A protein has these predicted regions:
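Helix-start/capping segments and mature chain N-termini
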Residues: 1-80, 102-279
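Ordered, amphipathic secondary-structure segments that act as subunit-interaction surfaces
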Residues: 75, 80-93
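Short, internal active-site loops enriched in acidic
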Residues: 94-99
Length: 279
């Protein structure tokens, strides 16, 4: 099976699932989501993804009736039905209503889940990045479906033959369109602190934990575009890409001064997923 989906009790192929036009994610982007990778009935970093998902739903006041263990069981059931051995899992909770009104105070919620096959590369090539001014609003720490600025920049990056775009806010690097970004400098890793300017990435947190375990000092502080361009190494982290080096920004060669250390961290992140798959 190439893809699988679920919506409020419906199970089936993506093209067979029907979503009502009253779903507020369509008109207002009134929804939160999360995404993970997995293998058969097991979801990588499952607990952290579900915790973030439920926290964001609560922050937006989206009402739901399931508990964490119930959502976990449902996601695993859907994964088993998909029969995919390695997949990208997307799950979304929207505030639904029967007519198009802005207020959603008394609305119930709808759960959408999709699964698609994915291949996680063991030794991917370094990334090419572009930079752009961060013009987003101040809710970047909530994983909502309002992704237009990220979509526009990701499209621009692809048009320029690049893999990702880096947001820069008043000279300060925040994050990428679908990833977190960190730099290695003089044996330290530097990454933007958690705030309403960035998504608290799960892969980001695992990378920082690995740095601490092997003796790399972790600095969670803002860093500038100039620091980015002159860093010893640049690391991009996400749920699906795990950890990747970047070697080009805006057409200029960057990093490359600590390749062994950067590769060690990338390999540690990949090994975690590989070990997860064979358990």
């Amino acid at each position: 099976m190439n893809s699988y989906a679920y919506y409020n009790g419906q199970f089936g192929k993506r093209e067979d699932i029907l979503i009502p036009l009253s779903d507020r994610s369509i008109f207002f982007g009134d929804a939160v989501y999360d995404a993970a990778i997995g293998s058969y009935d097991r979801i990588h970093w499952e607990s952290e993804h579900i915790d973030r998902f439920l926290l964001n739903a609560n922050r937006l006041g989206i009402k739901h009736t399931f508990k964490k263990n119930e959502l976990s069981s449902l996601l695993r059931e859907i994964a088993v039905k998909s029969m995919l051995d390695c997949y990208f899992l997307y799950f979304q909770l929207s505030r639904k209503t029967l007519c198009r009104v802005h207020s959603g105070l008394d609305a119930s919620s709808s759960l959408l889940v999709t699964l698609d096959p994915i291949k996680i590369e063991e030794s991917p090539s370094p990334l090419k990045l572009i930079t752009a001014e961060d013009l987003r609003y101040s809710y970047c720490d909530i994983k909502t479906v309002n992704l237009l600025p990220a979509v526009l920049l990701a499209t621009e990056a692809e048009a320029k033959g690049c893999d990702e775009a880096v947001f820069v806010k008043n000279g300060i690097v925040t994050e990428c369109t679908k990833s977190n970004i960190s730099i290695l400098n003089r044996g330290r890793i530097i990454t933007h602190p958690k705030s309403n300017r960035i998504l608290p990435g799960i892969a980001r947190e695992h990378l920082l934990d690995k740095c601490r375990k092997i003796g790399i000092k972790v600095l969670e502080r803002p860093f500038t575009k100039e620091e980015l361009l002159t860093a010893d190494e640049i690391l991009v982290t996400s749920t699906t890409k795990l950890c990747r080096r970047a070697h080009t920004i805006d057409g200029k060669t960057v990093g490359g001064k600590e390749p062994a250390l950067a590769e060690e961290l990338c390999n540690l992140m990949y090994e975690d997923f590989a070990n997860f798959c064979i358990k």
